[in-house]
Amino acid sequence: MLEVKQLTKTYDGGKRSLQDVSFTAQPGEVTVIIGPSGAGKTTLLRSINQLITDDSGQIRFDDQDICALNKRDLKHIRSKIGMIFQNYNLIESLTTIENVLHGGLARKSTIAGVLSLYTKQEKEEAIQLIDEVGLKDFAFQYCSDLSGGQKQRVGIARSLMQHPEMILCDEPIASLDPKSTIIVMDILKKLAKKRGMLVLINLHQVDIAKEYADHIIGLNDGHIVFDGPADQASSQDIERIYRDSAFATS
């Protein structure tokens, strides 16, 4: 379980991106964060993985407060958290299987990683994951030759190579066409349901969120304005989530 308690983040210049954000997300469920641009969605995901530090609050995962960990322990817990990025974050000059194998680098020695010394078992696992995301025929194709949807699926397979317990997805379908969007969201839903993973996704598309999410969190101006089952998010709730300056002060 992921438990966020009273998380607050203020950037230089006094811009407060998150204000007393609290929620829980469960394994085996897709939790989707929605809200207007600048609501704090990306800041929240980056905080959970401690890519940025917060002013106050707790982020509890795997029975630990991520915010309070030293560098060594933080590196260990990050190995349990996969990241899917809007811009794919692949090495395009490498093949699909090479990119996927890089997902397991945290388990290898520095020398083995630098020299790309992968075992037969690791290569077989990478092929299995590539097949799982529907790209077996593209395993040895350079990622520069893949479509956006295919690249995002490579990113998912690479994340799975990490053996994560939680996957954080920052706008994973923002650049995809409708067909690729469905394929990627189906894969993420399957990870939650069949692998029992905790999947946390930032989205702009409300219709996709309501179709695929078990749990929706609505952010506006750094505040949570909705937190509940997806099927209970009414049109009034959605309107409030996307209302301009819901927490503006004079």
Q: Which residues make up each language-model segment?
A:
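H-loop/switch region of ABC-family ATPase nucleotide-binding domains
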Residues: L203-H204
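Helix-to-loop junction immediately C-terminal to a conserved catalytic motif
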Residues: N49
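Conserved catalytic motifs of ABC-family nucleotide-binding domains
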Residues: H163
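Conserved ABC ATPase "signature" region
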Residues: D65, A112-D137
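Catalytic Walker B motif of ABC-type/P-loop ATPase nucleotide-binding domains
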Residues: I167-D170
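Conserved ABC ATPase signature
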Residues: Y142-L146, Q150
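Helix N-cap at the start of a conserved alpha-helix in ABC-type nucleotide-binding domains
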Residues: P178-S180
